[in-house]
């Protein structure tokens, strides 16, 4: 297959864009019924409302990883999420199960901030500075190659749901941890566990150097200089505005927000925690939510008895997380129905071998 043929194969035909929503909903419903248990559609909380109704499971990264690991029936897993999630699903399922991503452009800018070549350059420098005292810990929002490196070096993956438990375990294994790619989740979790900010360093992958003014012996956490482009846009000013204009409103944010924002919020937690906390709250309560716009909108719809707003009123959905839509889902399902293979996510055996070590450590500890 030449490059032009590859591009044509990976490009959704224009006819899907001209179908009505009703036509697409009917076709997706029909194909799901025909395929039955051979098809499984996991969907992350951040996905568009137009695809969520077709999900067989909705959850955060930890929930979806656990669900993928336990699903042995489905021949086809069509992941409504992003690339790193589909990679994780492929590694946790059997070789006979096929994982596809409806739109290959669906990604995570934070995961892309940690490149495997940057990590392999960083590791010997950190070993030179600290010796064999570092355990690597990677957020599940990372590439399979990053997970594999971490697993090969005795480390583990982590999600926002289990971060406190996993980081606590990691700090018992070695004197310090190297947390990547999200500096904010790493900082917020370590601080919650009692590690002072002055004992945390930054690793700058662009300059390939450590940013730290303190005594190296005091450094307990090394944070990769990465972040979520969505959660970094929630600010202290946003919180001040809520406190001023809505003094009875409770503020809950995702721990990918900056330390300043998390410290000033009333609570923080994973998407699962945010959904559960608000769902279980008393009618009439007021909430400002600091996370992705699609999820905030869905929480508002599902809780009409409460007043809920986005912490940042100008927040947009994550543009890379937001790629998968109804036309791409239908395109993928029709390919499966016709016996065609499109947009398969397949991680090579060597990468899978060590990445699984990191993932399985996390799942066992969770």
From Swiss-Prot:
GO terms for molecular function: 4 iron, 4 sulfur cluster binding; metal ion binding; quinolinate synthetase A activity. Coiled coil: none annotated. One of its GO terms (cellular component) is cytosol. Transmembrane segments: none annotated. It catalyses: iminosuccinate + dihydroxyacetone phosphate = quinolinate + phosphate + 2 H2O + H(+). GO terms for biological process: 'de novo' NAD biosynthetic process from L-aspartate. It is found in: Cytoplasm. Iminosuccinate binds at residues 44, 61, 139-141, 160, 254-256, 271. Its cofactor is [4Fe-4S] cluster. Pathway: Cofactor biosynthesis; NAD(+) biosynthesis; quinolinate from iminoaspartate: step 1/1. InterPro entries: NadA (IPR003473), NadA_sf (IPR036094), Quinolinate_synth_A_type3 (IPR023515). Its EC number is 2.5.1.72. It is an enzyme of class 2 (transferase). [4Fe-4S] cluster binds at residues 108, 228, 318. Keywords: 4Fe-4S, Cytoplasm, Iron, Iron-sulfur, Metal-binding, Pyridine nucleotide biosynthesis, Transferase. Binds 1 [4Fe-4S] cluster per subunit. Belongs to the quinolinate synthase family. Type 3 subfamily. Catalyzes the condensation of iminoaspartate with dihydroxyacetone phosphate to form quinolinate. This is Quinolinate synthase. It comes from Listeria innocua serovar 6a (strain ATCC BAA-680 / CLIP 11262).
């Amino acid at each position: 297959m030449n490059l032009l043929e590859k591009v044509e194969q990976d490009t959704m035909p224009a006819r899907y864009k001209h179908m009505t929503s009703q036509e697409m909903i009917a076709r997706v419903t029909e194909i799901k019924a025909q395929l039955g248990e051979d098809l499984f559609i996991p969907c992350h909380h951040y996905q568009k409302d137009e695809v969520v109704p077709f999900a067989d499971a909705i959850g955060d990264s930890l929930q979806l990883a656990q669900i993928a690991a336990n699903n042995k029936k489905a021949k086809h897993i069509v992941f409504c999420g992003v690339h790193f999630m589909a990679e994780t699903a492929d590694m946790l399922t059997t070789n006979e199960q096929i994982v596809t991503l409806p739109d290959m452009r669906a990604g995570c800018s934070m995961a892309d901030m940690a490149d495997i070549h940057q990590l392999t350059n960083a590791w010997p420098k950190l070993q030179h500075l600290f010796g064999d005292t570092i355990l690597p810990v990677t957020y599940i929002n990372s590439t399979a190659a990053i997970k594999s490196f971490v697993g090969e070096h005795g480390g583990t993956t982590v999600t926002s749901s289990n971060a406190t438990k996993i980081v606590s375990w990691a700090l018992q294994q070695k004197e310090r941890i190297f947390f990547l790619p999200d500096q904010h989740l790493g900082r917020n979790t370590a601080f919650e566990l009692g590690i002072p900010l002055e004992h945390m360093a930054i690793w700058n992958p662009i300059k390939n150097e450590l940013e730290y003014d303190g005594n190296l012996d005091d450094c307990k956490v090394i944070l990769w200089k990465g972040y979520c482009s969505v959660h970094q846009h929630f600010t202290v000013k946003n919180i001040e505005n809520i406190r001023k204009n809505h003094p009875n409103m409770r503020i809950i944010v995702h721990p990918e927000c900056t330390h300043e924002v998390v410290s000033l919020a009333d609570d923080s937690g994973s998407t699962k925690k945010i959904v559960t906390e608000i769902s279980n709250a008393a009618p009439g309560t007021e909430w400002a939510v600091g996370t992705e716009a699609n999820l905030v909108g869905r929480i508002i719809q599902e809780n009409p008895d409460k007043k809920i707003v986005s912490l940042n009123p100008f927040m947009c959905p994550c543009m890379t997380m937001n790629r998968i839509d109804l036309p791409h889902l239908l395109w993928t399902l029709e390919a499966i129905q016709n016996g065609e293979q499109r947009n398969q996510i397949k991680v090579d055996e060597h990468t899978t071998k060590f990445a699984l070590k990191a993932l399985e450590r996390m799942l066992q500890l969770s």
